[in-house]
Every structure is written in C-alpha cells, then in structure tokens.
Amino acid sequence: MEWDADDLLIEPTTEVENDYEDLCTQWVNERMAPDLLPFAEEIVSRVLDRIEAQRETLQLAIGTSSATSYRSVLMQTELERVKFVLRSYMRTRINKIDKYAQYIQSHPNLLLYLSSPERQYLLRHQQIVHRHYMDSFLREVPAKMNKLDDKVGNLSMVASPDMDTAVFCVVNESVEENFRVSENEYITLDKGDVLILRYSVISDYLRLGVVSLI
C-alpha cells in the first residue's frame, strides 16, 4: 500500500497553537525581565514532546513519498521556528544564570525557579568559578578577604538584577483595585492597556499572568 505524505501530516490543533503562543509569551517575558523568571516546565515539556512527534511524522512522510511535498516543507519550516524560540528561551535563562549565579544561589526562593538541569548547571558553574579564582589569586590573600560575596556599605561584590529598570507591559486581565506605582501615585490596570513601569512594581503581576512584557 502506498502512503501519501500529506495523509501523514497533521494540521496543528488549537491546543498546539496555544502552547506555541504560551511559549512565545514566556520567551518574551524572560528576555525583557531583568531577573530570572520561574521555568515554564509544563509548557516546555509539552512543546518538546510535540517537536519529537512532529519530527518522527515528517521523517515518515518524507520516507514514504517519492518527492517532498510542499506541505511537508512548510511543516519543517514551522518546526524550525518553534525550535528557535525554545532554544532562545533556554539560552536567555542560561545567560542570566551565568550573570547572576552568586545572587541566585544565595536566594533559596530563586533556586525554585530553576529546572533540574539548570540547578546542576548553576552548581557546576559556581564550582568552576570558585576553583578558578582560588587557583588564580585567592590562595594568596588572607582568608577574611577571599570571600566572593562581601558587602561594604551599599556596595556588594554580588551582581544582582536591576529591579527598578523600566519595562513595557500589556495588561492581560483588568484589576479592580487601584494599582500603586509610587508612594503617591496610583493607576488602574485595564485589559489591553500598554504601560511603561518600573519592573519592581509589576513583577508579581507578571508571575501571575495579569501582565506580559513586550
């Protein structure tokens, strides 16, 4: 029996499209937020499963067709687009872990935002950095001066994200009560509004999905 490649290619369902949109939202949020956001484990897991299933379907379709159909090429292109977003999302998180490793490690609540592989990466990263510093110069200085997390006054050796940086956001859900943005300033959050605010005042709403960064 001869199979038609087009018969093997399944059109994206609403659920699949929603997962891709959710992944894109997580990706943009992660890129625009100064700090590390909770890892989107459920979304990433579903997207990875569907990438693998689609890859197998495409291989079967191409293998059973005398010529690659135009439809399969489109599906391959779409697959690469999803993989690009996923890779960029993961790279963005790794870059933040590299930049704020000591800060993340010193805040147990932030460790909960990491996936299991990310926690392993952070631990290994810190071990390598500490060993490098010790071998390079820390062995030669007094013990009380070889810490990597010292703080003098308002100056800290530990790099931390700027939580007061300005960000653009879009409101996904209206909030009934007035929203405090400074000591004497309140605004309303209405669905569809696009605002520029200090990240620190909307970070909780971002994690709740009330707003998204743009």
Swiss-Prot record:
Main localisation: nucleus
**Domain of life according to the entry:** Eukaryota
Looking up Gene3D superfamilies in the UniProt record yields:
1.20.58.1030, 3.40.5.60
Subcellular location as annotated: Nucleus
Task: List the SUPFAM superfamilies hit by this protein, alphabetically.
Answer: GINS helical bundle-like, PriA/YqbF domain
Entry's Gene Ontology cellular component terms? cytosol; GINS complex; nucleus
Q: Which residues form the signal peptide?
A: none
Q: What CDD domains does its record include?
A: GINS_A_Sld5, GINS_B_Sld5
Its keywords, alphabetically, are: Chromosome partition, DNA replication, Nucleus
Q: Set out the biological process GO terms recorded for this chain's protein.
A: chromosome segregation; DNA replication initiation; double-strand break repair via break-induced replication
Q: How does it assemble?
A: Component of the GINS complex which is a heterotetramer of sld5, psf1, psf2 and psf3. Interacts with sld5.
Q: What does this protein do?
A: The GINS complex plays an essential role in the initiation of DNA replication. Has a role in chromosome segregation and is required for bir1 localization.
What PANTHER family has UniProt attached to this entry?
Answer: DNA REPLICATION COMPLEX GINS PROTEIN SLD5, SLD5 PROTEIN
Family (UniProt): Belongs to the GINS4/SLD5 family.
Instruction: Tell me the protein's name.
Output: DNA replication complex GINS protein sld5
Taxonomic source organism: Schizosaccharomyces pombe (strain 972 / ATCC 24843)
Output the lineage of the source organism: Eukaryota, Fungi, Dikarya, Ascomycota, Taphrinomycotina
